[in-house]
């Protein structure tokens, strides 16, 4: 879902122009990725643009990061994510700014999950379960642009952002299964490596 608006001040009044469907272009990047590109309507110097979009993804290891800051100022930068509680993620925030708003809500939802068999002769199993869904929301207001400064090697290291990494599966009635390593597991893997 993609929505976008351009706001211009004309004769002392704010004029809102909505993004039309014919200004949205789809590009199939790969078997699993579709990119939507769009051209903002009525863009003029001094205008304000607003856009929002939703990403639905089955790729658990690729929970999208969000940059709250960029090369242009942002009046309001918001990121919302919903994830089932049986997928545990760690979040990493970066940058010098703190969140103006940080919310978490929990609701219940029913899921159908396919569990692959352990070997070639064991069939996949589908289970139905009800579990919590965690809804997170982070907001930064009046975010200044990030500008290149002398002696700065990479602006990417300073941009205000949030990113995620899957750390464990935690299904009800099953043992927790960590997927993110730590220094102890890394050392153990190195010691057990035959090469």
Over which residues does each language-model region extend?
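Solvent-exposed beta-hairpin/edge-strand motifs
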Residues: 1-18, 76-92
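Short, mixed-charge, low-aromatic patches
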Residues: 5-9, 34-38, 156-165
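Non-catalytic accessory/assembly modules
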Residues: 9, 37-47, 51, 67, ...
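A glycine-rich, hydrophobic loop/mini-helix early in the fold
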Residues: 14, 23-24
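Edge strands and adjacent loops of beta-rich recognition modules
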Residues: 24-34, 59
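Short amphipathic beta-strand and strand-loop transition segments with alternating hydrophobic
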Residues: 26, 39, 125-127
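Secretory-pathway-linked proteins and extracytosolic
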Residues: 44, 56-61, 65, 69-195
């Amino acid at each position: 879902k993609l929505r976008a608006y351009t706001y211009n001040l004309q004769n002392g009044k704010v004029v809102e122009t909505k993004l039309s469907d014919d200004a949205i272009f789809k590009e199939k990047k790969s078997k699993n990725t579709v990119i939507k590109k769009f051209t903002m309507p009525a863009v003029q110097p001094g205008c304000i643009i607003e856009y929002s979009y939703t990403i639905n993804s089955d790729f658990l290891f690729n929970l999208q990061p969000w940059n709250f800051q960029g090369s242009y100022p942002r009046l309001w930068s918001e990121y919302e994510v919903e994830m089932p509680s049986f997928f545990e993620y760690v979040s990493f925030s970066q940058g010098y700014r703190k969140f103006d708003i940080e919310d978490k809500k929990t609701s219940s939802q029913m899921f159908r999950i396919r569990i692959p068999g352990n070997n070639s002769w064991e069939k996949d199993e589908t289970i139905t379960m009800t579990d919590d869904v965690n809804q997170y929301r982070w907001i930064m207001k009046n975010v200044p642009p990030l500008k290149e400064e002398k002696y700065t090697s990479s602006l990417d290291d300073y941009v205000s952002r949030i990113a995620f990494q899957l750390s464990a599966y935690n299904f009800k009635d099953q043992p927790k299964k960590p997927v993110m390593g730590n220094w102890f597991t890394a050392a153990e893997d190195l010691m057990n490596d035959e090469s």
